[in-house]
């Protein structure tokens, strides 16, 4: 329930911007929004969908730890960026500019739909993370 509340809060924040989907790559933020404890994952969170992208080593863990998420399993040679963003039908994706490397951002742009716009939304995520649950404070 705690994770669903956080997702809903993020969705509310996104609705006040021109960003329709959040791309989350920082491990701490992935855990904050999903509970996922594996070492390789990305999240895509839109108004209606929550997708966790991970490889076959963590598929079962993702199913167990992230029941509110659709699982997108990475496969060799798969254009996961385009395929997963097409599932959400995004126009503008917010990314954590303070964590996404220049090279990763270029890959995201090159491998996604050409009409897709990528925008830094680090400030919004930082504000979201200020909110702490009782469990986090302990």
Which residue stretches match the model-derived regions?
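Flexible, acidic/His-enriched mid-domain "rim/lid" segments that flank
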Residues: 2, 7, 48, 79-138
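N-terminal accessory/capping or targeting/presequence segment of soluble
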Residues: 1-86, 132-138
């Amino acid at each position: 329930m705690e994770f669903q509340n956080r997702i809903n809060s993020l969705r509310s924040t996104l609705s006040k911007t021109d960003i329709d989907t959040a791309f989350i790559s920082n491990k701490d933020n992935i855990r904050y929004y999903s509970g996922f404890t594996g070492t390789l994952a990305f999240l895509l969170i839109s108004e209606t969908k929550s997708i966790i992208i991970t490889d076959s080593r963590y598929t079962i863990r993702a199913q167990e730890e992230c029941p509110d998420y659709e699982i997108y399993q990475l496969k060799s040679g798969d254009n996961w960026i385009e395929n997963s963003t097409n599932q959400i039908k995004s126009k503008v994706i917010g990314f954590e500019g303070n964590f996404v490397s220049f090279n990763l951002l270029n890959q995201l742009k090159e491998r996604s739909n050409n009409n897709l716009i990528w925008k830094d939304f680090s400030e919004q995520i930082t504000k979201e993370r200020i909110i702490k649950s009782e469990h986090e404070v302990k």
